[in-house]
Amino acid sequence: MLTIGCHLSTTKGYAAMGETARSIGANTFAFFTRNPRGGSAKALDLDDVAGLQHILDEGGFGRLVAHAPYTYNPCSAKERAREFALEAMAEDLQRMEALPGQLYNFHPGAHVGQGVDAGIELIVDALCHVMFEGQRTCVLLETMAGKGTEVGRTFEELARIIEGVASRRPELAGTDMLGVCLDTCHISDGGYDIVDDLDGVMAEFDRVVGLERLQAVHINDSKNPRGAHKDRHEVIGGGYLGNPELGGGEHVLRAIVTHPALCELPFVLETPHDDLAGYAGEIAYLRGLAG
């Protein structure tokens, strides 16, 4: 059965997220490690976390995908912004130890005019600083759309980050500690043709990064055509991936959820819905396509 869910709010606690996930047919989900605008994190209630762990074990959930706030920019041109990202990421990873074996996804950041090479070096520095030997959380670099000066649009850029960590801190670079989250909207907006050549794109990922690094999928439709570098998510079937009137179609979505390189990974929806019913419908629909 396809492992799929959506972003859920931590407002009512960890166990409540698990109950909500079950209520909409999800067997994984994503959550922000703190307010998505950044700032301090709530104190952990370990009994609440244990309650979630019980739900995960009892319900046969796949791995969860914790998401760092969008405000983190470990390759910012501003030193204080970099320091904030490092401090918060380090704290996030320590807190994730209360829920071992899960995934921690973050946007690599934007170099803001320093250049891609400088941005990659700063991201490598950040990972070498915040990760620690023996951690039980796998850190994921998210594929980006290439908006502005974002780092991580190409598979080559992601590979360079991973290789940089492996060169400096090989004990932190195992596939159980450092990987990639593939966002379908982002890679399409970034220029990869997953509508007509998904097999070719996945073969390229394997050649450049290695499929063993791929740990999760953000499954989103896109409001923009391939190569737009916009990063504007659309509901499933409403955009350039799933809408036949825009050159996509159901066959594209089916190919994604059944692809041998993807089908066993946790899928997370980040589509624009106002209520959980929209996500429940997409979960059921995509699970039906997966067979």
Indicate where each model-derived feature is located:
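N-terminal pre-domain/capping segments
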Residues: 1-68, 72, 76-91
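Active-site beta-loop-alpha junctions enriched in small/polar residues
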Residues: 7-11, 34-36, 69-71, 109-111, ...
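Acidic (Asp/Glu)-rich catalytic clusters
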Residues: 19-25, 45-65, 90-100, 128-135, ...
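Conserved, mostly hydrophobic/aromatic
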Residues: 21, 67, 96, 104, ...
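Acidic/histidine-rich catalytic cores of soluble enzymes
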Residues: 29, 129-236
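Conserved active-site loop/cleft motifs that coordinate metal ions or position small ligands
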Residues: 30, 216-218, 264-271
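Active-site acidic/histidine proton-transfer and metal-coordination neighborhood
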Residues: 58, 74-179
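Short, electropositive alpha-helical surface patch
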Residues: 80-93, 116-129, 154-164, 199-203, ...
